[in-house]
């Protein structure tokens, strides 16, 4: 498929491998040039972008793809945004550091404006777009988190965005980049509703520069190097987390009747207020403010309050945007999406009047296809919360969270894929998610056969989760039921065979996996401390995966192996009452350890190692004695409790299978 007629990938000359490089692209056109009604902007980029027409927001992208591949967005431009003379702007940030969010690749933009079949404007070294560095954005800043690239920090003076009005002159030299392997976007174009934030629920004062306060030893600040890329601490133009660490709240007053920004948001030095968006959401933080003197403002934000206040690093990420302002009036919107309910503007110096705060949300629009109604309104609220969770977590991939990581994690994806079909009636996000795992010839830094635990992402530290690769195969098996004619299933056969060949290298004399390499992940609980030796939950997963692969690709040897492993687990793990988690070597002989976790029991039944009719007492104990009140009831204290992910997920699945959805 041809995605561009004339456009070529370009970037500022010699700067395509520069970290955190922000570039503004602009072109102008007259509406008389348009010969039809279908005006479409096509965009591909290695970074993230924001497109606007005549100052109005058009969209954010791109949808992510595997290393070396780039998805093309096609934005239909509404006719009501057109004027006689039009200005199209595209802001692009090329991070060029490893992350779980945007992979490390040289910067480029490829863009083309077409009306019907006529090319109106296009990028090339001598094309129609001018470009210049976004100098208002501080370039040498710290990472947002271990998983995501850089924070956003600004140094502003009035007129910083005049370039968007076409006053930036001839621009900086552009250089054509190598041709790119392009893909369709496939997933729906997001919804970008604007959520106005007017309610102020608290205000107070703070002190800053407190050197005696503890400093957060964030690895993404202090451990920049060969495996975690970024700017070294001594090169940073702004050390936001260190500034925040030196701040302490002095007074905090929560209003009995919340005030409104309509009443004015005047903040003097060392003052703040806390605004409430009313619900947790993900999107781009916008603010309009003015100041009559030079001022420094930090906008911190979070999903919850701790002791009535906002913590900038509760989630092990830097939830703060830095503004250094000269006197003037400003409207600003972040180009990266963040997740929050509460926002706390803090004036470190100077004084500002905040006129407006909003979040331009970023959501998968397809969730509106589903409807649910129950007499019990609490069930309706749960459903809507689930719908909202999916909409924020799956705009282009299945992410485990839309905040700290924005990463496309396996295992999470197994469950989210089920939800996509239920809420949207399609599997478009899953198509992209699986295709991304198909496309690379190899995954750098990982052993042969292994796939990344999350993707698209970079893993120069060589970390992987073998269990998650097995969940990938289980998801692919269920995907066959959702999309039986998909070409991805036969195309991924070699990937599946490679994973299982990798795992087979760690089978012991009983055919069980022993001393699995990498990060062995059962769930976030005591179970993750019992993974040495022969880990039985991992082997339960392995057995189920082999059986799924045998059905996918009609391979009898996988089926036979899966059944043998099941039998061995039953022989070795079950102590007469519980399935125990692991066995260790003593004098060369495997010895079952007494440790037993709640999640291990769920693994046994979920993956078919145990069946209700064969282990009725255990199954009934799980149904009757376990659950959220087990500890309070003092039942089975020797069994380590499960956590939400994934133990409680599996428990709910077993309750559903047993005909107990209400429980």
Model-derived segments and spans:
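Extracellular/oxidizing-compartment recognition motifs
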Residues: 1-403, 412, 428-431, 444-447, ...
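Active-site core of glycosidic bond-cleaving carbohydrate-active enzymes
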Residues: 408-663
């Amino acid at each position: 498929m041809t995605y561009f007629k004339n456009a070529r990938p370009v970037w500022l000359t010699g700067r395509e491998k520069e970290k955190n490089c922000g570039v503004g692209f602009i072109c102008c056109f007259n509406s008389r040039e348009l010969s039809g009604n279908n005006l479409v902007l096509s965009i591909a980029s290695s970074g993230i972008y924001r497109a606007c027409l005549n100052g109005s927001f058009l969209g954010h992208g791109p949808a992510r793809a595997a290393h070396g591949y780039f998805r093309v967005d096609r934005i239909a431009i509404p006719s009501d945004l057109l004027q006689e003379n039009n200005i199209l702007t595209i802001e692009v940030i090329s991070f060029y550091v490893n992350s779980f969010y945007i992979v490390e690749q040289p910067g480029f933009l490829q863009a083309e404006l077409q009306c019907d079949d006529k090319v109106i404007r296009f990028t090339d070294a001598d094309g129609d777009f001018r470009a210049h560095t976004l100098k208002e954005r501080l370039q040498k800043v710290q990472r947002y988190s271990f998983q995501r690239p850089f924070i956003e920090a600004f140094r502003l003076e009035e007129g910083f965005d005049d370039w968007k009005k076409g006053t930036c002159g001839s621009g900086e030299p552009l250089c054509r980049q190598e041709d790119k392997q392009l893909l369709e976007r496939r997933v729906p174009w997001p919804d970008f509703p604007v959520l106005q934030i007017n309610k102020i629920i608290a205000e107070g004062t703070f002190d800053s520069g407190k050197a005696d306060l503890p400093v957060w030893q964030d690895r993404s600040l202090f451990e920049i190097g060969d495996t975690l890329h970024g700017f070294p601490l001594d090169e940073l133009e702004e050390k936001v987390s260190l500034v925040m660490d030196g701040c302490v709240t002095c007074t905090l007053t929560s209003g009995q009747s919340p005030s409104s920004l309509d009443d004015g948001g005047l903040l003097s030095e060392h003052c703040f207020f806390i605004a409430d968006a009313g619900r947790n959401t993900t999107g781009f933080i916008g603010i309009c403010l003015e100041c009559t003197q030079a001022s420094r403002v930090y906008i911190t934000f979070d999903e919850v309050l701790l002791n009535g206040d906002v913590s900038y690093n509760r989630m092990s990420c830097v939830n703060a945007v830095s503004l250094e302002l000269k006197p003037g009036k400003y409207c600003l919107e972040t180009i990266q999406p963040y997740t929050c309910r509460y926002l706390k503007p803090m004036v470190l110096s100077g004084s500002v009047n905040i006129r407006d705060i909003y979040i331009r949300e970023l959501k998968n629009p397809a969730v509106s296809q589903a409807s649910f109604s129950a007499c019990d309104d609490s069930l309706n609220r749960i459903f809507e919360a689930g719908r909202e969770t999916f909409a924020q977590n799956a705009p282009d991939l299945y992410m485990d969270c839309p905040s700290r990581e924005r990463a496309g994690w396996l295992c999470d994806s197994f469950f989210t894929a089920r939800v996509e079909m239920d809420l949207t009636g399609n599997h478009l996000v899953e198509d992209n998610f699986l295709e991304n795992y198909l496309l690379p010839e190899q995954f750098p830094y990982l052993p042969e056969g292994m796939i990344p635990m999350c993707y698209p992402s970079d893993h120069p530290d060589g970390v992987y989760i073998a269990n998650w690769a097995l969940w990938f195969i289980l998801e692919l098996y269920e995907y066959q039921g959702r999309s039986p004619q998909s070409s991805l299933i036969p195309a991924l056969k070699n990937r599946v065979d490679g994973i299982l060949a990798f795992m087979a290298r760690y089978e012991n004399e009983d055919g069980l996996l022993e001393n699995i390499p990498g990060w062995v992940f059962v769930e976030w609980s005591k179970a993750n401390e019992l993974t040495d030796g022969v880990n039985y939950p991992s082997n339960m997963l392995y057995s189920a995966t082999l059986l799924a692969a045998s059905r996918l690709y009609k391979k009898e040897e996988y089926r036979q192996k899966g059944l043998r492993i099941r039998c061995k687990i039953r022989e070795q793990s079950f102590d007469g009452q519980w399935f125990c988690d692991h066995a260790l070597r003593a004098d060369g002989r495997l010895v079952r350890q007494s440790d037993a976790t709640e999640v291990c029991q769920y693994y046994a039944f979920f993956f078919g190692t145990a069946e209700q009719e064969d282990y009725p007492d255990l199954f009934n104990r799980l149904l009757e004695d376990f659950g959220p009140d087990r500890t309070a009831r003092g039942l089975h204290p020797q069994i380590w409790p499960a956590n939400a992910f994934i133990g409680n997920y599996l428990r709910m699945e077993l309750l559903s299978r047993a005909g107990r959805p209400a429980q």
